A protein has these predicted regions:
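N-terminal type II signal-anchor transmembrane helix
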Residues: 2-47
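Polar/charged alpha-helical tracts
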Residues: 3-17, 69, 151, 156-161, ...
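Short N-terminal signal/transit or membrane-insertion segments
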Residues: 20, 24, 32, 98-103, ...
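Signal peptide-directed extracytoplasmic domains
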Residues: 32-201
Length: 345
């Protein structure tokens, strides 16, 4: 039979052979188009939205089964065929994917193999404490329990990895806007913020070659300056004031370190608050508090490394948020009468 077909083929003219190949190509093209249209086209018009959760180690067959069960694809076999023929059967990435029924088979494969996972964005303002960061993450539903974040922020392995001479990462979680996948773990968030901290720190020349303890002191100072100074231009001056107080063995007398003792900052500290027995009370104790009291931004960190020397020894906040700096205690008391006592009388 085949020999007869071969004889017929040999006797065909070159034009007839060409027509045969053109016809065969057209037939294959239309068959492929029909199969793709019938089996690979989108199921719906986008009204149905589904979150596909792919866990680590999930095989492609389980993923395909979930897609067919939720009516996101037309053919299980065709989807598997495309995965294999395109070499993507082992390239499916873990994550949470937002899919809808307007995506065709090829588009769905592209989404789950390129890692176009569902993301969420959160912003940590400069000067937020770890407690406040946990609150932001909880409100954004990134974490289900603040304790999970605290455990990650106090994880000894992470602290050791980044050479932080403390039992917490307070002060080293860089305040910024972050975009993360929905399934990010607290440990991943903490490490991401730590990496951002050290990346920004590297832009400050004076930070190089410091020991962890020396850096820690700078971050403590920066964290206090961050909470005290609302105006960025005042931060270097304020850093200089605190360093001058340290030099003459005077207490730092920072209200911000006392505010750190409360879960939520008070609008105004009372005299009794300044008498709270705590190593963080810099009215009662000389020197730095045990650790950072906030997570400072780059301007405050820079101010700690590049303080401005001056004759100022005191300061107080004015109604507009700026500070009045004084050289003497007498001048400071006069400013207090002008700005503070009038404000609260």
């Amino acid at each position: 039979m085949f020999s007869e077909i071969w004889k017929i083929w040999k006797n065909l003219s070159i034009w007839k052979k060409l027509i045969f190949f053109i016809g065969l190509f057209v037939l294959v093209f239309f068959m492929s188009f029909f199969v793709d249209y019938a089996l690979g086209r989108a199921v719906g018009d986008g009204k149905f939205v589904y979150e596909l959760h792919i866990q680590p180690g999930t095989g492609y067959k389980k993923v395909v089964k979930e897609l067919i069960e939720n009516k996101l694809i037309r053919s299980e076999l065709y989807f598997q065929f495309l995965l294999k023929i395109t070499g993507n059967s082992n390239k499916i990435k873990q994550g949470i994917y937002t899919l809808n029924d307007s995506l065709n088979t090829a588009q769905i494969i592209n989404v789950i193999t390129t890692g176009k996972v569902k993301t969420i964005t959160f912003t940590i303002p400069e000067g937020y404490t770890n407690r406040q960061i946990a609150e932001v993450l909880l409100n954004k539903k990134i974490i289900s329990d603040k304790k999970n974040f605290f455990d990650a922020a106090e994880n000894p392995e992470i602290i050791k990895k980044y050479n932080i001479p403390a039992n917490t990462t307070e002060g080293y979680l860089f305040p910024e806007t972050y975009t993360i996948p929905y399934n990010y773990k607290p440990e991943q968030i903490v490490e991401m913020m730590l990496k951002r901290f050290f990346k920004n720190l590297a832009t400050i020349e004076e930070s190089k070659n410091l020991t962890p303890s020396e850096l820690h002191e700078k971050i403590i100072l920066a964290s206090i300056v961050e909470r005290e100074a609302k105006k960025k231009e005042e931060q270097p001056i304020m850093a200089g004031v605190f360093l001058k107080r340290l030099k003459i063995k005077m207490p730092l007398e920072s209200c911000a370190t006392v505010q750190y003792l409360f879960d939520k900052p008070k609008s105004r500290l009372l005299e009794k608050d300044l008498e709270i027995a705590s190593p963080y009370n810099t009215y009662l104790n000389k020197g730095y508090p045990p650790g950072p009291i906030s997570n400072p931004g780059l301007p405050a960190i820079t101010a700690a490394f590049r303080p401005v020397e001056s004759d100022y020894l005191f300061f107080l906040v004015k109604p507009d948020g700026s500070h009045y700096f004084s050289k003497t205690h007498t001048e400071h008391l006069e400013a207090k009468k002008k700005y503070i006592d009038v404000l609260y009388e």
